[in-house]
């Protein structure tokens, strides 16, 4: 039950008020108001009661947020504030509203990080001369170099393991609790020594302590690295997929073997074009094969070898029939004329005379006067007066004429198939462009224009002069 809602209930005073000696330094009137705040009738100002500059609104946990209006409320609030300053803190003070910490957005995060590193460097430099290091399972050459750096910072390196060692440096990743009791790693764990890996000492402690200049020009180093990156990869605001002059993008299936350390240029680069017309795959593709077989061999060579000289029979038959029909059409005209001549002339053959004079002396015959024109004589010739029976016989003989051998044709049509020669593609560092055919690129105008200028190879000429074999003096 809230004591503010019941006026007849007296105010319960804390017994710590009487026991607190600081309450004796307050004026008698203020002390009376604190001990019994409901007994006064005269209004007292805040200036007389609260001389410690305490704010009454910060003590909202003393009373509920919603309360009825009471007389002399200002004096009562001031009395409560003074009493709270006199009393020790209680558990209710945790509910007070605390001011929130707002981050200053104007301070960049990089400056905060640099300032923290500077404090860390200062503290470690002051404490470093008190350190004693001991190296376990570390190479002697590395130990010698690290010892020199540690001595420059003022610390010491112990050659023998003692309990005066503060930092135990090792390369072993074994848990110290799993080691033998006589192992130095187990002893260092029991002695509460700092156990560091060698990588932590080199890359985190010594590197940060010795390279203090890297924190000074942080913005300058970032700007320089940004400029170097723009020279190689272009500006950062540019789209990466937009073609660049200094970068060659792969557009088809490619094979690129790079150096893992990125010290050397790519060892092998090959790109294959997509063939949309034919379904032939030019790039290497893995196939499911038996154990011990090459996964890149799909058996296409074996199929071509079998079908090279064993073509289907119906294709050869079509070729033979086409050649035979063309030959028969040419022979029909010749045979029909010869058959008609034999039927008319009988068994008579015209032969050349063996007399010499017959060849030299021309024979003249008198021309008849009633000679008809050629057109009329052709119409009255026996060829046009043949009976239908003779014409049918001629057609039968023409069809029964013996076949002649067809014209010669290639036994293997695939023997003259064009063989595709693979061109050698690559990248020309002189022209700064990528080529698909090396021979065509070397004969091009762009490459020859660069190769014909001697000033482009001035660096090589100077290098050859330096490495030239000296002439013998004798």
UniProtKB/Swiss-Prot annotation:
InterPro entries: BRCT_dom_sf, DBF4_BRCT, Regulatory_Dfp1/Him1, Replication_Regulatory_Kinase, Znf_DBF, Znf_DBF_sf. Keywords: Meiosis, Metal-binding, Nucleus, Sporulation, Zinc, Zinc-finger. A zinc finger (DBF4-type) spans 421-470. GO terms for cellular component: cytosol; nucleoplasm; nucleus. Residues 125-178 form the BRCT domain. Zn(2+) binds at residues 428, 431, 441, 447. GO terms for molecular function: nucleic acid binding; protein serine/threonine kinase activator activity; zinc ion binding. The keyword Metal-binding applies. GO terms for biological process: ascospore formation; meiosis II; signal transduction. It comes from the Eukaryota. It is found in: Nucleus. The keyword Nucleus applies. May act as a kinase regulator. Essential for progression of meiosis II and sporulation. This is Sporulation-specific protein 6. It comes from Schizosaccharomyces pombe (strain 972 / ATCC 24843) (Fission yeast).
């Amino acid at each position: 039950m809230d004591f503010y809602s019941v006026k007849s209930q007296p105010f319960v005073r804390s017994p710590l008020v009487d026991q607190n000696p600081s309450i004796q330094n307050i004026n008698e009137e203020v002390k009376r108001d604190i001990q019994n705040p409901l007994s006064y009738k005269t209004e007292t100002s805040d200036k007389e009661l609260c001389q410690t500059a305490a704010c009454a609104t910060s003590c909202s946990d003393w009373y509920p947020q919603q309360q009825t209006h009471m007389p002399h409320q200002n004096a009562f609030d001031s009395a409560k504030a003074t009493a709270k300053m006199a009393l020790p803190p209680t558990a209710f003070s945790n509910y007070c509203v605390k001011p929130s910490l707002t981050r200053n957005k104007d301070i960049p995060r990089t400056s905060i990080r640099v300032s923290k590193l500077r404090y860390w460097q200062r503290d470690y430099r002051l404490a470093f001369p008190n350190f004693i290091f001991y190296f376990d399972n570390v190479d002697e050459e590395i130990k010698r170099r690290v010892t020199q750096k540690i001595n420059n910072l003022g610390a010491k390196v112990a050659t023998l393991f003692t309990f005066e060692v503060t930092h135990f440096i090792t390369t072993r990743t074994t848990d110290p609790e799993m080691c033998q009791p006589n192992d130095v790693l187990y002893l260092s764990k029991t002695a509460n020594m700092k156990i560091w890996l060698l990588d932590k000492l080199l890359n985190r402690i010594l590197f940060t302590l010795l390279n203090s200049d890297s924190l000074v020009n942080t913005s300058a180093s970032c700007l320089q690295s940004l400029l170097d990156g723009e020279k190689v990869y272009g500006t950062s605001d540019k789209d990466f997929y937009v073609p660049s002059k200094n970068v060659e993008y792969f557009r088809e299936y490619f094979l690129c073997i790079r150096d893992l350390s990125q010290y050397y240029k790519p060892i092998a680069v090959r790109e294959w074009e997509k063939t949309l017309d034919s379904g032939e795959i030019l790039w290497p593709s893995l196939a499911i094969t038996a154990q011990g077989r090459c996964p890149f061999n799909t058996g296409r060579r074996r199929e071509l070898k079998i079908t090279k000289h064993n073509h289907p029979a119906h294709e050869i038959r079509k070729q033979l029939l086409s050649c035979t029909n063309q030959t028969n059409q040419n022979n029909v005209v010749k045979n029909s004329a010869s058959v008609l001549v034999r039927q008319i002339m009988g068994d008579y053959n015209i032969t050349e005379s063996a007399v010499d004079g017959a060849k030299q002396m021309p024979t003249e015959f008198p021309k008849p006067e009633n000679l008809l024109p050629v057109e009329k004589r052709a119409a009255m010739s026996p060829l046009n007066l043949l009976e239908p029976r003779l014409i049918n016989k001629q057609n039968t003989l023409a069809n029964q004429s013996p076949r002649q051998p067809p014209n010669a044709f290639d036994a293997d049509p695939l023997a003259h198939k064009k063989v595709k020669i693979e061109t050698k593609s690559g990248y020309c560092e002189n022209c700064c462009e990528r080529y698909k055919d090396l021979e065509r690129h070397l004969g091009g105008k762009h490459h020859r224009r660069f190769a014909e200028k001697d000033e482009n190879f001035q660096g090589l000429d100077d290098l050859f002069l330096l490495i030239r074999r000296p002439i013998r003096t004798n």
